[in-house]
């Protein structure tokens, strides 16, 4: 444990995250956040934290999702089982039990938002991905993978994007 800990990341500058998750333990000495900690205006959308979040100093903050100046959260979820930390934000976040998070219904709920995403980075569209879940993968929690496609043209497009990512060509 050291200082402030975050399940995915911590930054002084702006964070914009979508379709992220943390299932691991996050433990800090003077603060802990399940997904992100930042000092700037930031946002998290369609994400979840199912991991345990703890802080050594009981007078310090431990939050399931995020904390920061002007942090906006949309359509995100945290583990609400007894004994877990508070979400850390007032709106845009919903508690779900471990049992609820390990269901196909939870993956479907996440997909309702992901399917309409307009986020695109380096030609890669988040809407081309889907939340899926299997008992034997990721501890039974949802994770993202490329959607199933009905045409070979769509498959070729995704393969080209993957090849560009591997080679660093943009």
Region locations from a protein language model:
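Predominantly extracellular beta-rich ligand-binding scaffolds that present long acidic/polar faces
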Residues: 1-170
